[in-house]
Amino acid sequence: ALEAAKEADPKEACGLLLLVKGKKKYWPCKNIAKYPEQMFQICPIDYARAEERGEILAIVHSHPVSAPEPSEADKVAASKGKVPWYIVNPRMEKWSTYNPSGVYISPLLSRQWVWAVQDCWTLARDWYKQEGLELRDWDRPDDPEQFINAPMFDGAYEATGFRLLRDEKLMKGDLLLMSIGSPGLNHCAVYLGDGNVLHHLQNRLSCRDCYGDWLQSSTGKKLRHENSKAIWGTG
């Protein structure tokens, strides 16, 4: 695994630790992340082949530049599984292990953007969860460019419990669907009240932002959840 990480440098290497016929074996996988120098995404075909060969004991990946400690995005992704993560810095030749223990939620502000792990919908779901509202997650395509070209929000918001607002005044907890460099509505933001929103643009840190002219002109739909009255007193 260390040699694979050195060969991949400056990109992140990734793979799996397998138990095959009673022996541990490292199974290298292709990193299909759009920005492999900053993150990793295991090729699903490689993952499936690994499952056929043996039992998956751990996820392995490298941090070519930073210390081999789990990032916030690593902790979130690891919490979705049940196996430890081994992280190596190939230049320092140092390792760390992260054992997930239940669901991990990063701080809402200043999150690193990682597709399907820490993106605009993840941020919205985590905010609603802190407010006492559990929203379902949706499977995204492997490549965020596919989502930009064919966004899913328009066909999913009703099944998630939201209704379209017509002329109602925006209230805390409303969800805004926006078009950011896309032919459709590919971005979402939570309205916090007082002219502010919480959102996470691609390749930026999550932030509290002013709902100014640019974001307003990008907004295509304004939504309100069916349980908003019970939680925030609006409906």
Can you describe what each PLM-predicted range is?
Residues L108-V114:
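Second-shell loop/turn segments in exported
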Residues A1-A58, P64-V103:
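Conserved beta-strand-loop surface patch within small alpha/beta domains used
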Residues L135-R140:
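Surface-exposed patches in mature extracellular/periplasmic domains of secreted proteins
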